């Protein structure tokens, strides 16, 4: 399940970029 956590981290990073 470590892969899922990494994917969530990447998605959150992308959302943070678009939020700006």
From Swiss-Prot:
Is Isomerase among the key words of this record? Answer: no
List modified residues, type N-formylmethionine: 1
Per the record, the similarity remark reads: Belongs to the phenol-soluble modulin alpha peptides family.
**Extra remark beyond the main annotation:** Peptide production is higher in most prevalent community-associated MRSA strains than in hospital-associated MRSA strains.
Q: What does this protein do?
A: Peptide which can recruit, activate and subsequently lyse human neutrophils, thus eliminating the main cellular defense against infection. Stimulates the secretion of the chemotactic factor interleukin-8 (IL-8). The ensuing activation process triggers an inflammatory response in the host, thus contributing greatly to virulence. Also possesses hemolytic activity, which may contribute to the development of disease.
Q: Name one Pfam family in it.
A: PSMalpha
Q: What induces it?
A: Up-regulated by agr.
Query: What name does UniProt use for this protein?
Result: Phenol-soluble modulin alpha 4 peptide
Gene name of the encoded protein: psmA4
> Does the keyword RNA-binding belong to this entry?
no
List, in alphabetical order, the GO biological process terms annotated in this UniProt record: killing of cells of another organism
Q: Which UniProt keywords apply?
A: Cytolysis, Formylation, Virulence
Query: Please, which domain of life does this record's source organism belong to?
Result: Bacteria
